[in-house]
Design a protein with these regions (language model features):
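A short, Lys/Arg-rich alpha-helix, primarily the initiator
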Residues: 1-26, 139
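Short, charged recognition helix plus adjacent turn
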Residues: 3, 75-107, 157-164
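DNA major-groove recognition helix of helix-turn-helix/homeodomain DNA-binding modules
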Residues: 57-75
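Acidic, glycine-anchored loop motifs typical of Ca2+
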Residues: 90-95, 110-135
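Charged, low-complexity intrinsically disordered regulatory/assembly segments
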Residues: 129-164
Length: 164
């Protein structure tokens, strides 16, 4: 069994491998993991130590083999030049907590719809409407983020969802 790297303990890719090793002992060491992933052992070490940024294809391979779809989101939101400015990092909570967040963000959806209709009815956004419109956009962003997190949770934990 490989020993745990203390230098890479906070690295998302190393953490994903350690989690996968709980289910598959082949992921306990970089030496055993590298050929499974098709990534050179030294390159894998440098990725896990934060010295190299993995290629998107490598992240997809890790995600598939480790069963951790959340590392794709982490890659996009932290490392990808385009994603850093457009993708929010999602955090997988327990299902009950996640459902409460989703339900909380949906509770005011009817008022949100009404506000959007009021803002858009004259075909332009005036001074006072702009502040309200920005608030609507933020609420929609919260709904979207909660929906994406729920989809990520389902992809990780529900086998039927994974096969689609």
């Amino acid at each position: 069994m490989g020993k745990k790297s203390t230098l890479a303990v906070d690295n998302v890719f190393c953490t994903a491998r350690y989690e996968a090793a709980k289910e598959n002992i082949a992921f306990q060491s970089r030496e055993a993991t590298a050929p499974i992933l098709g990534i050179d052992r030294t390159r894998l070490a440098n990725i896990e130590l934060g010295k190299l940024t993995p290629y998107p294809e490598e992240v997809l391979t890790m995600s598939k083999h480790y069963g951790t779809p959340e590392i794709c989101n982490a890659y996009c939101s932290r490392y990808c030049p385009l994603g850093k400015s457009t993708v929010k990092e999602l955090t997988l909570d327990d299902l009950d907590r996640l459902m409460l967040k989703v339900l909380g963000s949906l509770k005011g959806i009817e008022q949100l719809r009404t506000r959007l209709i009021t803002i858009a009815e004259d075909g332009e956004i005036t001074g006072t409407e702009q502040t309200d419109f920005e608030g609507v956009l933020q609420e929609l962003q919260d709904v979207s983020q909660n929906a994406q997190t729920l989809q990520l949770w389902a992809k990780k934990y529900i086998d039927d969802f994974n096969s689609k």
